[in-house]
């Protein structure tokens, strides 16, 4: 093979991406640009070989979130490739969420060589530092250009990335300087591909595996001695942060700990907990709000981060007993109330270590403790009120959707809840309806950013998918529909149109004038959603009767592509009804 720069640029790009494939990468999101041309050409060839899925996105911000959705739903590392300059800055929102959600993405950014840095060269910035604050590692190939790297250099980089992501899943930034020429002649490309196919394409490489990583799992005597599983306690399961590939093991371990304790389980809608787990309590968030005095115990086992519930946070803050917090894939502090002992090696390791200290007799299944029966009675009272009130009229409200939708969307089909109101409403009103399926929400940074692109990424892996979102969250990321073939993915968007950020009505309405509230917080846009959907070639249906939702879902599933079901919310009626039903529950 010729050693010309153009050949080396392509060859090293092929080698790099092929090594990523060998560590499990299946999907790459490609953004437009010239400096990244060698990576784009290499990705195109690997796509032709049938070993890499490549999807293009003209918006780097959407691309980052789309890749995050793919990584979350698959459990695999995903790649994003961009050109230089501000393109890299647009990756930051997705990198922030990937960091906090502990999901593995490698952002590969093309750059100018060192000779063009800090001298005013066009589109040349300190992009290598843009993502530093949120990435697990920031790496670079040779600063003078990737053509200066050898085989071992490229292999070493990929091995470092694999090891880092096994130890601490999250985003990694790989910055790659390219010297011109960035294109390659057809003749030289054929020569380069022949060498690559002969020497590298089918070459096997040994990489660190999950069970081989040198990860020190400590036995915390203080934590295990603090728990007394023979006495009453509660298991509270927050949003699941582990890999979806580990979810079965997580649920098996949860089943073991519940079995030997008989404790009640409070499960977040996106906890990943199986619906058939013994000890589950419905309406637990409302029970805490109504009367947490019925919860008589002195220890709590918390799994994962805190749910989006002020009632739960207050309950835990006031709780005087022992709190143990078990984390998945997350070594940072996760307890904002600062009252727990934290264990960072995951529930499976926690249970294995704990049971290793128990006798066979102690490991036997125990009946449900009396507290479960008490809490379930309270939950049933609340369910009775909800079932009575929800169909008193046909008007659609947000809390009705949270209760009704998980009952009518097919129970084995996944759901994604956008941040802001939906995740909070479903926590309060869904009656554990999400636990029959995979349910996703991105709570790492708790923003509405990237909602549609995330959902489309999930839908590439697991579909049909239902996205439940407010209007501002959807319009904020409407560019997601520009990602390659995204409108052909089987995604139903349930658009809750309240013409603004309705969550702020609950927070600030009492102390602001109506117009002031609109301008400063609600920010209504009065979008013509029918015209907007048409512009993106996405079918849309408008539903105003709650009883018509089941047939609307039948329609959306029959379309087998991206569609929008829009429901308009009368905000004033919503708030009145919500207030009345909560009052009835709390006073019952």
Swiss-Prot record:
The protein's organism comes out as Prochlorococcus marinus (strain MIT 9515)
Q: Which cofactor does it need?
A: Mg(2+); Mn(2+); thiamine diphosphate
SUBUNIT field? Homodimer.
Spell out the reaction equation it catalyses: isochorismate + 2-oxoglutarate + H(+) = 5-enolpyruvoyl-6-hydroxy-2-succinyl-cyclohex-3-ene-1-carboxylate + CO2
One GO process term, biological-process aspect: phylloquinone biosynthetic process
Taxonomically, the superkingdom here is Bacteria
Pathway given in the UniProt record: Quinol/quinone metabolism; 1,4-dihydroxy-2-naphthoate biosynthesis; 1,4-dihydroxy-2-naphthoate from chorismate: step 2/7; Cofactor biosynthesis; phylloquinone biosynthesis
The record's function comment reads: Catalyzes the thiamine diphosphate-dependent decarboxylation of 2-oxoglutarate and the subsequent addition of the resulting succinic semialdehyde-thiamine pyrophosphate anion to isochorismate to yield 2-succinyl-5-enolpyruvyl-6-hydroxy-3-cyclohexene-1-carboxylate (SEPHCHC).
Q: Which InterPro entries match?
A: MenaQ_synth_MenD, THDP-binding, Thiamin_PyroP_enz_TPP-bd_dom
Top enzyme class of this protein?
transferase
Q: Which Gene3D superfamilies match?
A: 3.40.50.970, TPP-binding domain
Keyword terms of this UniProt record: Magnesium, Manganese, Metal-binding, Thiamine pyrophosphate, Transferase
Molecular-function annotations in GO: 2-succinyl-5-enolpyruvyl-6-hydroxy-3-cyclohexene-1-carboxylic-acid synthase activity; magnesium ion binding; manganese ion binding; thiamine pyrophosphate binding
Entry note: cofactor: Binds 1 thiamine pyrophosphate per subunit.
EC number in record:
2.2.1.9
Q: What is this protein called?
A: 2-succinyl-5-enolpyruvyl-6-hydroxy-3-cyclohexene-1-carboxylate synthase
Entry similarity comment: Belongs to the TPP enzyme family. MenD subfamily.
């Amino acid at each position: 093979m010729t050693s010309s720069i153009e050949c080396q640029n392509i060859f090293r790009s092929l080698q790099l991406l092929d090594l990523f494939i060998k560590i499990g990468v299946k999907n790459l999101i490609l953004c437009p640009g010239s400096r990244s041309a060698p990576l784009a050409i290499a990705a195109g060839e690997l796509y032709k070989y049938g070993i890499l899925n490549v999807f293009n996105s003209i918006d780097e911000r959407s691309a980052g979130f789309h890749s995050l959705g793919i990584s979350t739903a698959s459990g695999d590392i995903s790649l994003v490739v961009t050109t230089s300059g501000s393109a890299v800055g647009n990756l930051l929102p997705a990198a922030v969420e990937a960091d906090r959600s502990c999901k593995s993405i490698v952002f590969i950014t093309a750059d100018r060589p060192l000779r063009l840095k800090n001298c005013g060269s066009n589109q040349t910035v300190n992009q290598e530092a843009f993502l530093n604050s949120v990435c697990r590692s920031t790496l670079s190939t040779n600063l003078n250009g990737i053509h200066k790297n050898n085989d071992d250099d490229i292999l070493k980089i990929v091995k470092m990335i694999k090891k880092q992501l096994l130890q601490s899943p999250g985003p990694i930034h790989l910055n790659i300087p390219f010297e011109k020429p960035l294109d390659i002649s057809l003749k030289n490309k054929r020569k380069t591909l022949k060498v690559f196919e002969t020497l590298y394409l089918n070459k096997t490489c040994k990489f660190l595996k999950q069970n081989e990583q040198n990860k020190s799992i400590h036995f915390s005597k203080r934590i295990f001695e603090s728990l007394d599983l023979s006495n009453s306690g509660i298991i509270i399961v927050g949003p699941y942060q582990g890999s979806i590939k580990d979810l079965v093991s997580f649920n098996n371990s949860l089943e073991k700990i519940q079995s030997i304790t008989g404790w009640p389980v409070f499960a977040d809608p996106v906890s990943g907990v199986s619906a058939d787990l013994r000890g589950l309590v419905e309406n637990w968030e409302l029970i805490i709000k109504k009367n947490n005095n019925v919860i008589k115990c002195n220890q709590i086992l918390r799994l994962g981060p805190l749910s989006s519930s002020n009632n739960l946070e207050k309950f835990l803050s006031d709780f005087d007993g022992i709190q143990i917090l078990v984390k998945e894939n997350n070594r940072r502090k996760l307890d904002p109330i600062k009252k727990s002992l934290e264990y960072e090696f995951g529930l499976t390791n926690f249970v294995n270590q704990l049971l290793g200290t128990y006798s066979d007799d102690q490991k036997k299944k125990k009946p449900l403790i009396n507290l479960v029966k008490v809490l379930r009675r309270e939950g049933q009272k609340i369910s009775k009120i909800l079932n009575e009130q929800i169909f008193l009229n046909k008007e659609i409200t947000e809390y009705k959707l949270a209760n009704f939708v998980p009952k009518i969307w097919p129970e084995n089909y996944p759901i994604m809840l956008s941040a802001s109101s939906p995740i909070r409403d479903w926590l309060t009103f869904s009656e554990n309806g999400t636990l029959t399926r995979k349910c996703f929400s991105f709570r790492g940074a708790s923003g509405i950013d990237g909602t549609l692109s995330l959902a489309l990424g999930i839908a590439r892996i697991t579909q049909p998918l239902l996205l439940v979102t407010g209007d501002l969250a959807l319009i904020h990321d409407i560019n997601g529909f520009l990602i390659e073939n995204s409108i052909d993915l089987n995604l139903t968007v349930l658009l809750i149109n309240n013409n603004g950020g309705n969550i702020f009505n609950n927070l600030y309405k009492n102390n602001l004038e109506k117009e002031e509230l609109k301008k400063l917080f609600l920010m209504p846009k009065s979008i013509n959603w029918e015209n907007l959907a048409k512009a993106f070639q996405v079918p849309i249906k408008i539903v105003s009767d709650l009883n018509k939702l089941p047939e609307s879902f039948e329609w959306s599933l029959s379309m087998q592509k991206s569609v929008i079901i829009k429901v308009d919310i009368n905000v004033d009626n919503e708030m009145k009804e919500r207030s009345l039903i909560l009052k009835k529950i709390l006073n019952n």
